[in-house]
Curated annotation (Swiss-Prot):
Designated gene of the protein: clpX
GO cellular component terms listed in the entry, alphabetical order: HslUV protease complex
Name of the protein in its database record: ATP-dependent Clp protease ATP-binding subunit ClpX
UniProt KW keywords: ATP-binding, Chaperone, Metal-binding, Nucleotide-binding, Zinc
Function: ATP-dependent specificity component of the Clp protease. It directs the protease to specific substrates. Can perform chaperone functions in the absence of ClpP.
Family: Belongs to the ClpX chaperone family.
GO biological process: cell division; proteolysis involved in protein catabolic process
UniProt-annotated binding residues for Zn(2+): C13, C16, C35, C38
Gene Ontology molecular function, alphabetical: ATP binding; ATP hydrolysis activity; ATP-dependent protein folding chaperone; protein dimerization activity; unfolded protein binding; zinc ion binding
NCBIfam families: clpX, PRK05342.1
Record SMART domains: AAA, ClpB_D2-small, zf-C4_ClpX
Complex formation: Component of the ClpX-ClpP complex. Forms a hexameric ring that, in the presence of ATP, binds to fourteen ClpP subunits assembled into a disk-like structure with a central cavity, resembling the structure of eukaryotic proteasomes.
SUPFAM superfamilies listed in its UniProt record: Glucocorticoid receptor-like (DNA-binding domain), P-loop containing nucleoside triphosphate hydrolases
Length: 426
């Protein structure tokens, strides 16, 4: 045991050598002692090592081409949107790393600002799924919010802080991890200003929500009620910094294409001007020519648009794309239903004509890829009801007639085993 002094019984820290009089606290172990200063130092070292382990190293951050390739495995089509998202997400997390690791001392300090994303496109074309797949690849907390449920603070509905609460919950209340997550706000076109001119009456679910979202989109220290502000007004708040939270804001923006066409059509006036018909614009990406002035005319306020510098548009899915969605992705619907039938010991097969007929119905209903599952359920419902109760079915074949004419799928009976044939003959 380490002692110090003239015959005294002063104890020393076994690590730094300071006596018990030189420190606030000395903790004894089996034959060793440690002071409070050494404990603090150990804690600091451990925290630094844990922080380094949690941070995604720049070498490990997937490149834009790798992000796009990963998206290709799950999402069919939308190549322009994939490229835009891949670059935006890569630059966003590269910016976070630059802030955490510090900048190269040889370079002049440059502050990298955040670039949130605005996604435009019809319903059922993969906007939400693209964002979900991105979060899955990057292994970051991901939360989805519906803009139509939001209102200004003090009115019936959800506060914008509830969006941040969903992200914190997705991160298992790990605030540090939530601060580098992704928030997807859907139906943002529904909070457009009701008229182009500012109203004297309060628009609490439109322009008011846009105003409330400005700060968290830009980056602020927000106070989030852990159980919802409306029901528990006296609870303690969670502090979260949204500076490094990536916001992907999306909507169908029905009617925006007319605003774009009116503006683009005016350019076709005069000699030598390129004239584009409405049919030509409709067959291409509706929102490829979108400008901030179009979004302002639609009903978004300039400050809101300014915080969404990256614009990615998705297009209507054609028949070929819908057929590919049914069968090609890693978690394609056809593969899912084949697996469900396998669990009952039955093989399931779709003819090529059947897949095309399902795609035709989805286009006719105007539901895009989102409507494919509903059509599959309708087609397979009769056999999914009967199959579990039968043991004489080997295979179910879905044909074009099954989809178009509501004809039952073709059922291929199972051949009886040798023992079953013997029992039957007996």
């Amino acid at each position: 045991m380490a002692r110090i002094g003239d015959g005294g019984d002063l104890l020393k820290c076994s690590f730094c050598g300071k006596s018990q009089k030189q420190v606030k606290k000395l903790i004894a172990g089996p034959g060793v002692y440690i002071c409070d200063e050494c404990i603090d130092l150990c804690n600091e070292i451990i925290e630094e090592e844990l922080a380094d382990a949690d941070d995604v190293k720049l070498d490990e951050l997937p490149k834009p081409a790798e992000i796009r390739e990963f998206l290709e495995g799950y999402v069919i089509g939308q190549d322009t949107a994939k490229r835009t998202l891949a670059v935006a997400v890569y630059n966003h997390y590269k910016r976070i790393q630059a802030g955490e690791k510090g900048r190269d001392s040889r370079c002049e300090p440059v502050e990298l600002t955040k670039s949130n994303i605005l996604m435009l496109g019809p319903t059922g074309c993969g906007k939400t799924y693209l964002a979900q797949t991105l979060a899955k690849m990057l292994n970051v907390p991901f939360a989805i919010a519906d803009a139509t449920a939001l209102t200004e603070a003090g009115y019936v509905g959800e506060d914008v802080e509830n969006i941040l609460l969903k992200l914190i919950q997705a991160a298992d209340y790990d605030v540090k991890r939530a601060e580098t997550g992704i928030i997807y706000i859907d139906e943002v076109d529904k909070i457009a200003r009701k008229s182009e001119n500012p109203s004297i009456t309060r628009d609490v679910s439109g322009e008011g929500v846009q105003q409330a979202l400005l700060k968290i989109l830009e980056g602020t220290q927000a106070s989030v009620p852990p159980q919802g502000a409306r029901k528990h007004p006296h609870q303690e708040f969670i502090q979260i910094d949204t500076t490094n939270v990536l916001f992907i804001v999306a909507g169908a923006f029905a009617g925006l294409e007319k605003i774009i066409y009116e503006r683009v059509g005016k350019r076709g006036l005069g000699f030598g001007a390129e004239v584009r018909s409405k049919a030509e614009i409709d067959t291409t990406d509706h929102f490829a020519d979108v400008m901030p002035e179009d979004l302002i005319k639609f009903g978004l306020i300039p400050e809101f648009i300014g915080r969404l510098p990256v614009v990615a548009s998705v297009t209507n899915l054609d028949k070929e794309s819908l057929v590919k969605i049914l069968s090609e992705p890693k978690n394609a619907l056809v593969k899912q239903y084949i697996r469900l039938f396998e669990m009952d010991g039955v093989e399931l097969e779709f003819t090529d004509d059947a897949l095309e007929a399902i795609a035709d119905q989805a286009i006719h209903r105007g539901t895009g890829a989102r409507g494919l599952r509903a059509i599959m359920e309708e087609v397979l419902l009769p056999v999914m009801y009967d199959i579990p109760s039968r043991d004489d079915v080997a295979k179910v074949v879905v044909t074009k007639e099954t989809v178009q004419d509501n004809v039952l799928p073709t059922i291929v009976p199972r051949k009886p085993s040798r023992s079953e044939r013997r029992d039957k003959s007996a």
